[in-house]
């Protein structure tokens, strides 16, 4: 079995913001197109695994919608991704409906042949540190059973509450002081 050091060998996490992608597209179209092919392929895999008709994540929609994409690579090959962005949502706390600008996890995918190695947790924790946010302050866009299990395993105890808009929040979401949406 791999040790943690061996698992993380040759791995890199890269953050791509809208500005980064627009700059890459204008300055190095070849590199942009290569990244686009990899991200679009992984977005297709993510959507297929969730039985969705459309693709949640393409490089174009990351740039167009002002989201942030975290890419996990091994020896330059994309093996995982996490997309996060800000959405204006109506959230129900059990009594009242609140309209807020919320930090949202929009897509999260690790290639099948790289799962069960702790790499998803590494990627998720990298994003949390980068955005200076706790998992309970995120809204999760229609999370799959696998993502719900991941959250319960790594951030237990956590009770997840489904919202009418198909987002899911932690039960303590409203118990914490409201923070400003993260900086992009």
From Swiss-Prot:
In this entry, which stretches build a coiled coil? none
| All copies of domain N-acetyltransferase, residue ranges | 1-174
- The superkingdom of the source organism is Eukaryota
Example GO BP: regulation of microtubule cytoskeleton organization
Q: Where is this site: Crucial for catalytic activity?
A: 50
Q: Which PROSITE patterns match?
A: GNAT_ATAT (PS51730)
- Record EC number: 2.3.1.108
Question: What Pfam families does this protein map onto?
Answer: Acetyltransf_16
Presence of keyword tRNA-binding? no
Q: Which InterPro entries match?
A: Acyl_CoA_acyltransferase, Atat, GNAT_ATAT
Key words of the record:
Acyltransferase, Transferase
Q: Check the record and name the SUPFAM superfamilies matching this protein.
A: Acyl-CoA N-acyltransferases (Nat)
Sites binding acetyl-CoA sit at 108-121, 144-153
Reactions mediated catalytically = L-lysyl-[alpha-tubulin] + acetyl-CoA = N(6)-acetyl-L-lysyl-[alpha-tubulin] + CoA + H(+)
Entry's Gene Ontology cellular component terms: microtubule
EC main class here is: transferase
Q: Does the keyword Transferase feature in the UniProt annotation?
A: yes
The GO terms describing molecular function are:
tubulin N-acetyltransferase activity
Q: Which PANTHER family match?
A: ALPHA-TUBULIN N-ACETYLTRANSFERASE 1
Q: Which family does it belong to?
A: Belongs to the acetyltransferase ATAT1 family.
The job of this chain, per UniProt, is described as: Specifically acetylates 'Lys-40' in alpha-tubulin on the lumenal side of microtubules. Promotes microtubule destabilization and accelerates microtubule dynamics; this activity may be independent of acetylation activity. Acetylates alpha-tubulin with a slow enzymatic rate, due to a catalytic site that is not optimized for acetyl transfer. Enters the microtubule through each end and diffuses quickly throughout the lumen of microtubules.
Q: What is this protein called?
A: Alpha-tubulin N-acetyltransferase
